[in-house]
Amino acid sequence: MQDPNVMPEKITSLLDSEGATDIDISGYAPMTGGYSRLMARFEAKFTIDGEQEEGTFVLRGDPPEGQAIIETDRSQEYAVLKSVAPHLNTPPARFLDSKGIHIGTPALILEFTEAESTLPWIEKNGISDLPLKLAELAGAMHTIPVDQLPSSLARPTSGDPLTDQIQMWKKTAIDHVEHLPIFRYVAAWLDKNRPPPVPVSLVHHDFSTANMLVDGEGDLVVIDFELATIGDPREDLGYFKAYAQAAPPDLIDENPDDFLSRYREITGFSEEQVNPLVMTYFLVLGVIGVVSQIANVGSAMAKGETSSTNIAFNLDNLLFGQAAWMAATDALEAALDGEVN
């Protein structure tokens, strides 16, 4: 995917297989910023279903075997993007090479968006009304009818998303190449302090400013659904807060009362189900999807089964995470014991 001399022909082959004609691909150039997948931007002209199209597109594909930081499925990501498109502000997915027959690796093509990365936008424009728009984005995502989502999305095997996530903490500790006692501690703490349940919904699992853009109208655009599952929607709120500790600002903390009030209004959740203490709980629980992937690939690297400098770099994130988990559990314990207001 990095060679601009061969990729236009491969993209042409994919579009041709989808029934497009009069195909012209130009301006192919790899993009930076992709965390787990290879990405490139290109210009395209083609005719499909009797309509002529011209625009900028993004190719998103798997890295070479043994170099992936996390393992995900382009076919499922494509299906999720198609299902959420009527409900969310996200770049439309257009074409899929599920087996890599044309591109050389499993890949999908999306429409390019001129929206700007969130953190640079905030540096230039300030926080503005992004906290409320974040609440509305999260609320819209978490109220998409589950029966409209792909059947391939993982559901809670135990019937309870919290039980599944707590079990993942335990399994990650067991499967790791080294002992991870803090993971066992976190699992026990999460089990002891469960909040009231809410209905399951789509969970993004990497819901952060890194996967959001701001468009020309100042609205949030959400991207990158490769880790999505069906689970407890509050996991996304906790993950957002956890990520913001490493990459501030925390838009939720700008005005938590207004954020939570708007989110509850959209979702219909009660104050008992969604409040600052519950978000602190999910700050810990909600990161395990990404944490387990990083820990697992770290084990594979230690065993000589995979190699990538990015893997070693991302293992350092686990050390930062451990400090955040301990701080969160200590703060919540104090609040539950009535030591703080």
Residue ranges: model-predicted function:
Residues 6-23, 143-205, 268-271, 335-339:
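An alpha-helical support segment within catalytic cores of ATP-dependent transferases
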Residues 13, 17, 38, 79-86, ...:
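Residue-level signal for well-ordered alpha-helical scaffold segments within enzymatic catalytic domains
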Residues 29-36, 40-164, 171-182:
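ATP-binding pocket architecture of kinase catalytic cores
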Residues 32, 36-44, 59, 93, ...:
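Active-site acidic catalytic loop and adjacent metal/ATP-binding pocket
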Residues 74, 131-134, 162, 166, ...:
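Hydrophobic packing residues in well-ordered alpha-helices of helical domains and bundles
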Residues 234-270, 285-304:
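Active-site activation/catalytic loop segments of kinase-like enzymes and analogous catalytic loops
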Residues 251, 290-341:
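ATP/Mg2+ or Mg2+-diphosphate-binding catalytic cores
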Residues 271-285:
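All-alpha amphipathic helical-bundle segments outside canonical DNA-binding/catalytic cores
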